Structures are given as C-alpha cells and as structure tokens.
Amino acid sequence: MLLINAVNAEGRPVELYVKDGKIAAVGQDLAALAGENETVLDAGGLTVLPAFVDLHCHWRTPGFEYKEDIETGSRAAAAGGYTFVNLMPNTKPVCSSAAQAAMVEQKAAEVGLCGVNQTVSITEDFDGKTIDHLKTLPASVKFITEDGHGVQDNATMAKA
C-alpha cells in the first residue's frame, strides 16, 4: 500500500510505503516501490505521525471492569494510534504484586491490540507505609506509582 499526499510532524510532504503490514519506506516519490496493482491511498494533506505511548491509563481490571476493561481500553488505544499503554494500579484489589501485573499483561496480550505495562503500587494496597513487596518485584515490572494517593511519608518514599 502506498500512502500519498500526507505531511509529517514538521508539515513537510511525505509518502509511506507499507509492505506486509509494516512501514517499508518513508519519503517522497515512492510510487516505484509500489508496483502497478498496489493500493494507493490519498491522505488529503493529513498529518502522518508515529505510534503513541500513553503513560497514564486507567483500564480498571480487576475490580472495576464496568468502568473500562482490557478489551475496551485496548480498542480505544488502538483506534487512537496508541501502540503501548501504562496502566495505573488503582484497581480492586490494588495492583501490588508481580503476579497481578502479569495476569493483566497476559490478558492484554490475548486481546493483542497494543502493548501493555501494568504498574505496581509503591506501598502495598496504597497503605502509605508498607514497601516490602517492592523487594520481590522482577525486572519485568517497569514502573511503580502511588497513582492519585502520593506517599505522604518522606522516609517511606526514600526507601522505596
């Protein structure tokens, strides 16, 4: 597929050639790459941007799926051009363990519409004090946060 008549983030004209579902070339005058039977889409001067990452999402699995679940969140993210999202731990129960984070990430992988990272709470169950669970977190847990609560004790935050 060849996308023509687009502009990049700087407002400059750009074409994209997509082969086998992946961007194979970005530039100008890419028609030679496409071939005669290739689909050509006219972007009509719209801006073409790379995928986005949302570092602060609330998909609410587990416990609050009536607000948003992994499938609806994944669909919304993909529709908006987001290929990766970071989920906050204010779920029920609070995501305070690697096992719970892995469960959410596995469910998201099964949906398969975007990459998902489940964050873990800084203090266990947002209790503001207990950080022992952090010692057991594997490297696969990339972020910790007390989303919306804040750690009120400076010493606890320093230890975390």
Question: What does each model-identified segment do?
Answer:
Residues 6, 21, 45, 56, ...:
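Divalent metal-coordination and catalytic microenvironments
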Residues 91-102, 108-160:
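Histidine/acidic-residue-rich, glycine-tolerant segments that coordinate divalent metal ions
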Residues 39-41, 53, 86, 117:
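Hydrophobic/aromatic beta-strand patches that form the interior of the parallel beta-sheet core
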Residues 1-2, 7-50:
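Histidine-rich, glycine-flanked metal-binding segment
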Residues 46-110:
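Metal-associated gating/positioning segment near the N- to mid-region
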